[in-house]
């Protein structure tokens, strides 16, 4: 009878197991490689860190105890030579929303570690040991656009067409102004040039000086009778 009661209590009380994620933030003061290893989960990973660079990791913890042991080892960033001994760190899988800091101090590199544990979706409780059985229904509403629009808002297509019309009109006006300016610059009338052929003193020469020819005088004048208007040529000859 006592054995049956104990057997019943074992199946009635849930075991202390958790299902969630252990988040880690790693920061170092020098360039290095950090090698992580979890023997209970057959998990291993190597992370490259630059100086004062923070990298985040998430380790899935399915159905394990409320504590997790992780082995850390700091390596040289280029050669991979060990810069510290293997350090075993024990993390509590406590879903309290608090980041717990810790430091691994070696001779050459200081490694800062921040840890936080949070439950997987569908689990809750201090160590994520309880599974949620409630289901939530989400109502989604899809709005179908109608063809009618409010009188104060134009459809996007009409607004685009109106903008194109306005741009076309403005472009045409600017083009016409440019053509008109070019026409005025290259086709304006040139200033006229003329020669005044009027003579102030025009008179017939044969009315005052008849044709004559003087021989033997030092000055000989010849009169051109074919032209009656101011076409006298005077030649002087010296003997």
UniProtKB/Swiss-Prot annotation:
Name of this protein = Skn-1 dependent zygotic transcript 1 protein
Q: Which UniProt keywords apply?
A: Developmental protein
GO BP, one example? mesendoderm development
UniProt xrefs under InterPro entries: Mesendoderm_Regulator
Q: Which domain of life is it from?
A: Eukaryota
What intrachain disulfides are recorded? none
What is the stated purpose of this protein?
May have a role in mesendoderm development during embryogenesis.
Gene name of the encoded protein: sdz-1.2
PANTHER family assigned to the protein according to its UniProt record, in alphabetical order: PROTEIN CBG11437-RELATED, SKN-1 DEPENDENT ZYGOTIC TRANSCRIPT 1 PROTEIN
- Species: Caenorhabditis briggsae
């Amino acid at each position: 009878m006592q054995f049956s009661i104990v057997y019943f209590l074992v199946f009635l009380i849930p075991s202390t197991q958790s299902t969630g994620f252990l988040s880690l933030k790693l920061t170092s003061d020098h360039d290095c490689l950090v090698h992580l290893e979890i023997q209970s989960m057959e998990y291993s990973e190597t992370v490259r860190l630059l100086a004062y660079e923070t990298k985040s990791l998430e380790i899935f913890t399915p159905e394990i105890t409320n504590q997790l042991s992780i082995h850390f080892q700091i390596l040289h960033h280029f050669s991979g030579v060990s810069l510290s001994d293997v350090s075993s760190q024990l993390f509590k899988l406590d879903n309290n929303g608090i980041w717990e800091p810790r430091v691994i101090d070696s001779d050459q590199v200081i490694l800062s570690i921040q840890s936080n544990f949070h439950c997987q979706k569908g689990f809750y409780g201090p160590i994520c040991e309880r599974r949620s059985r409630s289901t939530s229904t989400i109502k989604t509403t899809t709005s179908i656009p109608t063809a009618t629009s409010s009188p104060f808002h134009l459809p996007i297509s009409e607004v685009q067409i109106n903008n194109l019309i306005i741009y076309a009109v403005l472009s045409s006006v600017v083009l016409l102004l440019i053509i008109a300016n070019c026409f005025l610059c290259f086709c304006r009338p040139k200033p006229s040039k003329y020669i005044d052929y009027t003579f102030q003193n025009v008179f017939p020469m044969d009315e005052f000086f008849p044709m004559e020819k003087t021989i033997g005088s030092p000055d000989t004048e010849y009169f051109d009778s074919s032209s009656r208007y101011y076409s006298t040529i005077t030649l002087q000859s010296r003997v």
